[in-house]
Amino acid sequence: MGFRTLDDVDVTGKRVLVRVDFNVPMAQGKVCDDTRLKRHKETLLELQKRGAKLILLSHCGRPKGQVEPEFSLHPVVQVLEKIINQPVNFASDCIGVAVQTAVEALQNGGILLLENVRFHSGEEKNAGSFAEALAHNGDLYVNDAFSVSHRAHASVEGITHFLPSYAGRSLQCELQALEKGLGKPERPVIAIVGGAKVSSKLFVLNHLVKKVDYLVIGGGMANSFLAAQGVCVGKSLCEHALIETVKKVIEKARECQCTLLLPVDAIVGFRFEKDAPHRLYDIGDIPEDGMILDVGTRSIAHINAVIDKAATLVWNGPLGVFEMSPFDQGTIAVARHAAELSLTGKLVSIAGGGDTVFALNHAGVADDFTYLSTAGGAFLEWMEGKMLPGILALTQA
């Protein structure tokens, strides 16, 4: 990747605008999950130690270009202070005279968190005037948020046109990990793609069949693939309108010599609810009144056997309705098997996306994977092979 990093700049006494991702879940004005905050610890402490004046930019939620108190970043301050063990100042806006005054008051090593950039409509419109107003408070810019780099927004892309721009350590680390996944991976490579709908991951599937040796299709989207092969899927979620499109993906996989793995058996429920009546069926025997809610034991064994042969695993999306017991067992079993191989150094495992992170935490193995990306949309677009606007901007800055 042709961009500059923190190794290429002297930050002492400089006002450094750092784009972080503090879009964290909150309830009653309190942060519920600080995972994303922790991802930026290395970058922030390095800049602070090197005597920079840190000004942090982030969004939170979707306030639609106006001030909505429930999306304020103020509750983040106290949690961030504990994580980095440093005082953090807060500004009630992200541009304007009050911000300028707060920035001028910063000492070397001082940290200032600005209010939600999405409180201004210019952020999501990538308005040049708003990007310039943000840039006015800095001498240089650091993007440390891979998870927002698929957005051509003012604090991600627009600002790079006004300031010398660099990649932060978290962004660097993420890109290096992802390069091991699909850029220059150890082979064989297996990808697991799950989730409810094929329609949301068509671009991903079409890209992956060209890049990986084995492609496991799980979750609700597997039903459309089974239906495309003439399998009766009963009352299971199935996008019948996409059957012809799915057939093209199957054909493309064959042309690219990518082995598709579909369920050979399934846990079938008769109501869509936790602990609903259920039993194991071979895939050719799904009853008309049943719903496929998880992969079966033979399917798990097939997937694990392929993981045993693989050197690299890329995972996005659960294999079943993991939010409801007992339909989480397929995802848990495969996740634990992959984690075990990762811990012994036999497998490079990279997983990403909100549901995937949640599922791996649920399985108790999130920390055992080689790399876990907290990015949702950015991770998917990377899996599609797209160059992300925020990353492209750094290569051109």
Swiss-Prot record:
It comes from the Bacteria. The keyword Cytoplasm applies. One of its GO terms (biological process) is gluconeogenesis. PROSITE patterns: PGLYCERATE_KINASE. One of its GO terms (molecular function) is ATP binding. Pfam families: PGK. Its EC number is 2.7.2.3. One of its GO terms (cellular component) is cytosol. InterPro entries: Phosphoglycerate_kinase, Phosphoglycerate_kinase_CS, Phosphoglycerate_kinase_N, Phosphoglycerate_kinase_sf. It catalyses: (2R)-3-phosphoglycerate + ATP = (2R)-3-phospho-glyceroyl phosphate + ADP. Substrate binds at D21, F22, N23, R36, H59, C60, G61, R62, R118, R151. It is found in: Cytoplasm. Keywords: ATP-binding, Cytoplasm, Glycolysis, Kinase, Nucleotide-binding, Transferase. ATP binds at K201, E323, G353, G354, D355, T356. SUPFAM superfamilies: Phosphoglycerate kinase (SSF53748). Pathway: Carbohydrate degradation; glycolysis; pyruvate from D-glyceraldehyde 3-phosphate: step 2/5. Its main location: cytoplasm. PANTHER family: PHOSPHOGLYCERATE KINASE, PHOSPHOGLYCERATE KINASE 1, CHLOROPLASTIC-RELATED. Monomer. Belongs to the phosphoglycerate kinase family. This is Phosphoglycerate kinase. The lineage of its organism: Bacteria, Pseudomonadati, Pseudomonadota, Alphaproteobacteria, Hyphomicrobiales.
